[in-house]
Swiss-Prot record:
Keywords: Cytoplasm, Transferase. SUPFAM superfamilies: DsrEFH-like (SSF75169). Its main location: cytoplasm. It comes from the Bacteria. Pfam families: DsrE. GO terms for molecular function: sulfur carrier activity; sulfurtransferase activity. The active site is at C78. Its EC number is 2.8.1.-. This is Sulfurtransferase TusD homolog. Belongs to the DsrE/TusD family. Could be part of a sulfur-relay system.
Length: 125
């Protein structure tokens, strides 16, 4: 099966984003494909490279990055939601700084919609 994950849960402050990560791992272990992971609303905070949890806490940003790199997954971020919440890359930044974590890319709802049309399942967290 081909899955799309839509994540609107923040990186911390709830269990939604971590649950999405855990389910993504299990979906892949079961031999299914994840075509796209799309972060929107408060979920865009999962892509903030300045997230710095305590040493005894899970760094979910790093977990998403590792999963994307090791499984060659696309981590898409809603550009509108990201800009509203201060998540920017070099191109959208008003100065020379950016806080978009590696492996995440800014994209629009059109990319998400096209991916959904080709998937068997859409999971929202």
């Amino acid at each position: 099966m081909v899955y799309i994950f839509a994540i609107k849960s923040p990186v911390y402050g709830g269990q939604g984003a971590y649950l999405a990560y855990q389910i993504a791992e299990e979906v892949l272990k079961a031999g299914h494909q994840i075509k796209q992971i799309f972060f929107f609303q408060d979920g865009v905070n999962n892509a903030n490279r300045f997230v710095n949890p305590a040493n005894d806490e899970i760094n979910l940003v790093q977990k998403w990055q590792h999963l994307a790199k090791s499984k060659k997954l696309a981590l898409h971020l809603c550009i509108s939601a990201a800009q509203r919440r201060g998540i920017v890359d070099q191109q959208t930044s008003t100065d020379s700084t950016n806080n978009l974590a590696d492996m995440f890319i800014l994209s629009g709802l059109g990319d998400f919609s096209r991916a959904v049309l080709t998937a068997d399942r859409l999971l929202t967290f």
